[in-house]
Amino acid sequence: MAEAAITRYWCHECEQAIEEAMVDEIKCPSCGGGFVEEMTDEEIERLTNRQPEPGFSQWNPIEHPGETMDSDDEDNDLGREFEGFIRRHRRASTLRRVLDSIHDDLADDQERDSSILINAFNQALALQGSVLDPDEGQGDQGGSTNDDGLLEEYVLGAGLSLLLQHLAESDPSRNGTPPAKKEAVEALPTVKIEEVVSCSVCLDDLEVGSQAKQMPCEHKFHSSCILPWLELHSSCPVCRFELPSEETKDLNEPSNIGRVEDSHEEVRADGPGNVSESSNRPWAIVPWLNELFSTREAQNAGGVSTDQQSPHTSGTNPNAGHS
C-alpha cells in the first residue's frame, strides 16, 4: 500500500520548509509563526536554493531594525543640510532687502550720498571712512592675495559679519533722515481716535476713543511708538513726510564721505604714502549699493581707474570751464 503523500509547507517568516504534519493548527514549529503556505516540492526547492540580496528581504526591517534607523539618520542628515541651505538663502535675501531699504533712504537725501570702496586684492571694505578687513586678527596667511575676489564674497562670505556689525554700530542718522527738532515733535497734536486704524510702528490697532499722536501728513501713531522714532528720524514711517530736523554737524566741517572720496591715504590699508594709478593695490569706488550684487563689476573692480569713477578722487572740478 502506497504511503500517503506528506504535505509540505513553507514558512515565510523564517524562510524554511516544514515537513512535519500539523494537525490542530497550521503554524511553523520553529518560529511559531502562522504565515505558512502549502507548496509543491519544486516550489520549495526553488525557494530553498534562492539567495536573497541583503537588505531586500520583506522582513529585513523587522529582523534588522538598526539598518532602518541608519537610513532614517541619513535622511535626517540630508533634511538638515537642505534646511541649512534654505536658511542661508533666506538670510541672503533678508540682507539684500535690508541693503535695498538703506539704499532707498540714502537716495532720498542727495547730501548724504555714500560710496563703498572695494580693494579687489586684499579683500577689504571701506565704508564711510572705516576700513573693514575680513582677514584682520587671523594672522599672517603667507602674504598671498586673492585676485579673483568677488563682491558676493564680501556680502555673503567672510565680510558678512563685519558688514552687519558696521551697519549695527553706525549712527542711525546716517541711514536715514536726521532726528526731528524737539519743537516740531512737541507741537504734534494729540487726537482722539474715531475709527480703528493701525499704528505702522508696532502694527497694533489704535482703539476707538484712545489718544494718539498725529503727524502733519495725518498719519496717526501711539505716542510711545512715534516719539522714540522721531528721536532718530524726522520722517514719517509711512509716507516719509519730513518734519524740521536737527542739524548736528558743523556745515564747515568736512564729512566722513568727503574724506573717503577725496583722500586715498585715509582708507588705504597699507598706510600713508603717495598714491598713483600704477599702485599694485588699487581702490575702485562703487556707488553705494548700486553695483553691490553685480558679479562682473565687482570682479573687474581692481582694474577700473578711480579717476574715471568719481570726479572727487581725481581732484577734477566738475564745473571747470563754466563761468
Swiss-Prot record:
<dbReference type="GO" id="GO:0005737">
    <property type="term" value="C:cytoplasm"/>
</dbReference>
<feature type="compositionally biased region" description="Basic and acidic residues">
    <location>
        <begin position="259"/>
        <end position="269"/>
    </location>
</feature>
<feature type="region of interest" description="Disordered">
    <location>
        <begin position="248"/>
        <end position="280"/>
    </location>
</feature>
<feature type="zinc finger region" description="RING-type; atypical">
    <location>
        <begin position="199"/>
        <end position="240"/>
    </location>
</feature>
<comment type="pathway">
    <text>Protein modification; protein ubiquitination.</text>
</comment>
<keyword id="KW-0863">Zinc-finger</keyword>
<dbReference type="InterPro" id="IPR013083">
    <property type="entry name" value="Znf_RING/FYVE/PHD"/>
</dbReference>
<dbReference type="GO" id="GO:0061630">
    <property type="term" value="F:ubiquitin protein ligase activity"/>
</dbReference>
<comment type="function">
    <text>Possesses E3 ubiqutin-protein ligase activity in vitro. Acts as negative regulator of salinity stress tolerance mediated by the ubiquitin-proteasome degradation pathway.</text>
</comment>
<dbReference type="GO" id="GO:0008270">
    <property type="term" value="F:zinc ion binding"/>
</dbReference>
<dbReference type="Pfam" id="PF13639">
    <property type="entry name" value="zf-RING_2"/>
</dbReference>
<dbReference type="Pfam" id="PF14369">
    <property type="entry name" value="Zn_ribbon_19"/>
</dbReference>
<dbReference type="InterPro" id="IPR001841">
    <property type="entry name" value="Znf_RING"/>
</dbReference>
<dbReference type="InterPro" id="IPR039525">
    <property type="entry name" value="RNF126-like_zinc-ribbon"/>
</dbReference>
<keyword id="KW-0833">Ubl conjugation pathway</keyword>
<dbReference type="GO" id="GO:0006511">
    <property type="term" value="P:ubiquitin-dependent protein catabolic process"/>
</dbReference>
<keyword id="KW-0808">Transferase</keyword>
<keyword id="KW-0479">Metal-binding</keyword>
<keyword id="KW-0862">Zinc</keyword>
<dbReference type="GO" id="GO:0016567">
    <property type="term" value="P:protein ubiquitination"/>
</dbReference>
<keyword id="KW-0346">Stress response</keyword>
<keyword id="KW-0963">Cytoplasm</keyword>
<feature type="region of interest" description="Disordered">
    <location>
        <begin position="296"/>
        <end position="323"/>
    </location>
</feature>
<protein>
    <recommendedName>
        <fullName>E3 ubiquitin-protein ligase SIRP1</fullName>
        <ecNumber>2.3.2.27</ecNumber>
    </recommendedName>
</protein>
<dbReference type="InterPro" id="IPR029040">
    <property type="entry name" value="RPABC4/Spt4"/>
</dbReference>
